[in-house]
Amino acid sequence: MRVSQILNPTLREVPAEAEVVSHQLLVRAGLIRKSAAGIYTYLPLGLRVLRKIEQIVREEMDAKGGQEVLLPIIQPAELWRESGRWDLYGQELMRLNDRHNREFCLGPTHEEIITDLIRGEIRSYKQLPLLLYQIQNKYRDERRPRFGLMRGREFIMKDLYSFDRDEAGLAESYKKMYDAYTRIFTRCGLTFRPVEADAGAIGGTGGTHEFMVLAESGEAAVVYCPDCDYAANVEKAECKPAPVAGDAPVGAYRGVDTPGTKTIEQVAEFLKVSKSDLVKSLLYQGDDKLFLILVRGDREINEIKVNNALGPFINLQLAGPEVVLEKLGCEPGYVGPIGAPKNLTVVADLEVPLMAKAVCGANAEDKHYVDAVPEKDFRIDQILDLRMVNAGEPCPQCGSPLKEARGIEVGQVFKLGTKYSKALNAVFLDENGAEHPCVMGCYGIGVSRTMAAAIEQNNDKDGIIWPIPIAPYHVIVVPVNMKDDQVRETGEALYQELLKLGVEAVLDDRDERPGVKFKDADLVGYPLRVTVGSKTLANGEVELRDRKTGEVQLVKVEELAGRIQGMIREALGVK
């Protein structure tokens, strides 16, 4: 392809609305254009990258026995009501009515549709296991679409669904997909880490892992152990209770005046104690239920853990000041567990019962209790892991200090179990004619998100640095002066030779200054650049530059195409 023929409108200025590097560079490099909030058009070079990621995904899904299907985007509401997710999904579900006022949604995911298909087609254990996948547009009515392709209203995903006879079969399917995902992201040239994760709205009773592309700009925090294979999203990471320090109080707890101290920091400073000596008490409302959640004062409540342990809830949130006043008779800053109403469930994090003595709110303005002993001076109805983990805490598997990194979720694998097959009656008959629900797994990859994540991980001040396997083209040939016959003809000849060898090459045949061509090449992120100039041609050589390392080599004209072909084959793993 010739640059003069490509629709590739590059920009020198950073778009005002682009907050993250990937969004900025996708627009500046002429790969996408915004159609509406969270909705984008893919231009030719952007679509080439997308198709390459899709092809890698297809090859690995097919290699594991997956069969490709195409499921409808528009899904009937009755299927979502059968599964119980029509209301659970909330406002992010894009809903619409047809002319007959029948309700539908634009699919954010396809568990209901695929399970409905299977219940109509699968009858016998002999038809299992089954792996079906699609690459399809998905829709989510994000309240605030942002970050370009990272969080849009329309996005492209691969989702595969496995159907097995039993949990052992599901475990085998899960491992197949886990291994396939590892190969996919390795082939894409990305640095990533699989981590234990939360199942979210998709649900299920089994395990789940997220595949995180590591990048400093990542919106998700992950913790991992450098000494064993433990890694988890902070939403899921297990916490080991910290060792207890201090002695139990000699006498009973007592009330103290704490005027104007509504925060943990203010109370700790006023009483000259550590934040870890305080009990943080927060009233949560899960749908129509109320819970008093207790954690140590230096810890943060993990609402994902709270929802999973006590719910799931359609809406879990901190109770408003008016509810706190009605139930506990005080402002939120003075809430405490001593004397909590019997109809209020008190749930404590694992560390709270281990505290020798504690400072807590007295449920009265400007008052706190000191020397309170958990489970002696106040009741605890449930004890659960409810807090966020921090870097430096002990690994739950081996005890080594955990480290933290930032990541971008690009894939997730779920063990759904029988959540959807029971709800939608997708059953099969075993060898004895007994009926059983299919045991399901769900495995998603954000294809368009992977494209953005690759840029977040691979960029510099000049633009994108595409890994060779997913680059729009492998090499760009840049004749620096199109008016010089030798330069122009050599560039053309090298371009044609590269094409004959199967190298994806593009020729910058524009009558532009060399600086403009070089800036565009770096911005778009072609992995290799061949510069054809009169000075090097005088010695029978051209310049070969590696975009990632910046390394420049002078290569004989007659050796160039073969050299590049070898580099590309090595990067693609072709023998």
UniProtKB/Swiss-Prot annotation:
Membrane-crossing residue ranges in chain numbering: none
Keyword line: Aminoacyl-tRNA synthetase, ATP-binding, Cytoplasm, Ligase, Nucleotide-binding, Protein biosynthesis
Major subcellular site: cytoplasm
Assigned EC number: 6.1.1.15
One biological process term in Gene Ontology: prolyl-tRNA aminoacylation
GO molecular-function term, one example from the UniProt record: ATP binding
Localization terms from the record: Cytoplasm
GO cellular component terms attached to this protein's record: cytosol
EC class name: ligase
Catalytic activity field: tRNA(Pro) + L-proline + ATP = L-prolyl-tRNA(Pro) + AMP + diphosphate
CDD domains: ProRS-INS, ProRS_anticodon_short, ProRS_core_prok
Record bears the keyword Disulfide bond: no
Ranges in coiled-coil conformation: none
Gene3D superfamilies, per the entry: Anticodon-binding domain, Bira Bifunctional Protein, Domain 2, YbaK/aminoacyl-tRNA synthetase-associated domain
Entry remark concerning the domains of this protein: Consists of three domains: the N-terminal catalytic domain, the editing domain and the C-terminal anticodon-binding domain.
Family, per entry: Belongs to the class-II aminoacyl-tRNA synthetase family. ProS type 1 subfamily.
Quaternary structure, from the entry: Homodimer.
Record function comment: Catalyzes the attachment of proline to tRNA(Pro) in a two-step reaction: proline is first activated by ATP to form Pro-AMP and then transferred to the acceptor end of tRNA(Pro). As ProRS can inadvertently accommodate and process non-cognate amino acids such as alanine and cysteine, to avoid such errors it has two additional distinct editing activities against alanine. One activity is designated as 'pretransfer' editing and involves the tRNA(Pro)-independent hydrolysis of activated Ala-AMP.
Record's protein name: Proline--tRNA ligase
Gene: proS
